[in-house]
Structure formats: structure tokens, C-alpha cells
Amino acid sequence: MKYKKKEKEELKKILTEEEYYVTQENGTERPFTNEYWDFNGEGIYVDITTGEPLFTSKDKFHSSCGWPAFSKPIDRSIIKEKVDKSHGMVRTEVRSKLGDSHLGHVFCDGPEELGGLRYCINSASLKFIPKEELKEKGYEEYLELFK
């Protein structure tokens, strides 16, 4: 599957206001009220703007942060990290590599047994693809993650 970055004008047409705000304006959605914070489906999470595979449900864990939390991305090469000094804090921002979408932040307070990282990701930046639909939606290569 080939992924493509969309122009801002196209994104404004296809994304909700919140999805656009989060992914294109570095926004943050409200905790504990977003779509995936307590979701437990089996599958992968992709960038809502490009379809790039980002995270798998196998690496998702329950955290008290109010947003979906993952121990690692599917592949580190598909994300980029940068220093974020907004809101009087110093954090590490996580963005999708191709789409350059703001996803959330990564922290070093994740479960030690999972590597110690917590990728705290906005649901509004993600689209969930259920395991049962991976083949039909062009993500067949990721089925092996669930064997």
C-alpha cells in the first residue's frame, strides 16, 4: 500500500474540526472522552491523514493518562520525535513521518517490562483497522503481528 501526504485544503475537507486541530495545529483532545483511550479491539492504528501504520493493539496498555498509550510504534522509522517546549514544559512530541501529523508525546514512565516508554497518543490522530479487516483494507502484511 502506498501512503501519500495530503494538502492542508484536502485535509480540511476530510477531517473533523478536532482531527484537523490535533493533527495539523498540534492540538490535544480532552482526556478520558476520546475514542480509543479505553478501547480494546485487536488490530492496528494508522495515521488518520495518510493511512500509515503507526501502532498495534499488541503494544497498547492501560494508562491513567486518559489517552491511548502504547509501549512502542510498529516501526520506529515511521515516526519522528522533536522537542516540544509549549505550555511551559519540555516534552518529546511524536509526529508521523510521512504525514507530519501531530500524534502526541512520548514519556519515560511506561511499564518497565514493556521497555519503559509510554507513547501517549491523541485518538483524533488515529484510525483503527480491526484485525479482521487488515487484508481487505490493504494491510495484510500486518496480520503476522497477531499470530
From Swiss-Prot:
InterPro entries: Met_Sox_Rdtase_MsrB, Met_Sox_Rdtase_MsrB_dom, Mss4-like_sf
Active-site residues from the entry: C120
MsrB domain ranges (all copies): 8-131
Keywords of the record: Oxidoreductase
Family membership noted in the UniProt record: Belongs to the MsrB Met sulfoxide reductase family.
EC number(s) per entry: 1.8.4.12
Source organism (scientific name): Clostridium perfringens (strain SM101 / Type A)
Class of enzymatic activity (EC top level): oxidoreductase
Keyword presence, Oxidoreductase: yes
GO annotation terms (biological process): protein repair; response to oxidative stress
GO cellular component: cytoplasm
Protein name, entry field: Peptide methionine sulfoxide reductase MsrB
Lineage per the UniProt record: Bacteria, Bacillati, Bacillota, Clostridia, Eubacteriales
